[in-house]
UniProtKB/Swiss-Prot annotation:
This is 1-(5-phosphoribosyl)-5-[(5-phosphoribosylamino)methylideneamino] imidazole-4-carboxamide isomerase. It is found in: Cytoplasm. GO terms for cellular component: cytoplasm. It catalyses: 1-(5-phospho-beta-D-ribosyl)-5-[(5-phospho-beta-D-ribosylamino)methylideneamino]imidazole-4-carboxamide = 5-[(5-phospho-1-deoxy-D-ribulos-1-ylimino)methylamino]-1-(5-phospho-beta-D-ribosyl)imidazole-4-carboxamide. One of its GO terms (biological process) is L-tryptophan biosynthetic process. Pathway: Amino-acid biosynthesis; L-histidine biosynthesis; L-histidine from 5-phospho-alpha-D-ribose 1-diphosphate: step 4/9. The gene is hisA.
Length: 239
């Protein structure tokens, strides 16, 4: 999935605009403009993968930024992974046929673990399971409902179901530029043999190095890039 450690820019979409949330909570968003412009900016800066999230889909359960997603796919030629509102095999089929390379399942995987294997059987290697952790437990439905699941145990479970990778988001530090908690990532990495993508809290180049040292295969970075804490080129240089 990732031949070497990769820094992946986030393009989180709400109401057709790029936003970043603080702690995964609605109403805390800062807007950063047009998704296509943002995506092109990161591709021009050297991004090999884009991380797209339909936040309306994550919160409401139905994808609401399809036009923006399609526009990004048409405007760029890099790998794209997409999450938010993917609830069925048909949803995944549609996105993968549209040109998305990997679909990210969160709520759907918790509610119906079999969906991971069903999609993987049809599209091998295309499923990443999103484990969003808040107060040490996996949360779903736009980070509003706790499942009681331990992230490391859940990661191992979804690997057995056929997941090709895990996206671990530390919601407690998401969007806050407060630094990463590499020990939380290391717990998940140690539980599985598939790639683990780390997300949440990256604020410095040292954070990126810490995630790499913890065993993550890649990290998704949003607010730090949009706020100019460092450039994508600088991030690539340290890994």
């Amino acid at each position: 999935m990732f031949p070497s450690f990769e820094v992946i820019p986030a393009v989180d979409m709400q109401d057709g605009q790029v936003v970043q949330l603080v702690g995964g909570e609605r109403g805390t968003e800062t807007e950063y403009g047009d998704p296509v412009a943002a995506a092109q900016r990161w591709v021009d800066a050297g991004a090999e993968t884009l991380h797209l999230v339909d936040l309306d889909g994550a919160f409401e359960g139905e994808r609401a930024n399809a036009d923006a997603v399609e526009a990004v796919l048409e405007a760029t030629d890099v790998s794209v992974q997409l999450g938010g509102g993917i609830r069925t095999v048909d949803d995944a089929d549609s996105l993968l046929s549209m040109g998305v390379d990997r679909v990210i399942l969160g709520t759907a995987a918790v509610e119906n673990p079999d969906i991971v294997g069903e999609i993987n059987d049809r599209h091998p290697g295309s499923v990443v399971v999103s484990l969003d952790a808040k107060d040490g437990e996996v949360v779903v439905s736009g980070w509003t409902e706790s499942t009681g699941l331990d992230p490391a145990e859940a990661a191992a479970r979804y690997e057995a179901e056929g997941a090709g990778g895990v996206l671990f988001t530390d919601v407690d530090v998401e969007g806050q530029l407060s630094g990463v908690r590499a020990d939380e990532i290391a717990r998940v990495v140690d539980a599985v043999d598939i790639p683990v993508i780390a997300s949440g809290g990256v604020s410095t180049l040292s954070d990126i190095e810490a995630l790499k040292d913890a065993g993550a295969a890649a990290t998704v970075v949003g607010t730090a890039l949009y706020e100019g804490e460092f450039t994508l080129e600088e991030a690539a240089a340290v890994v």
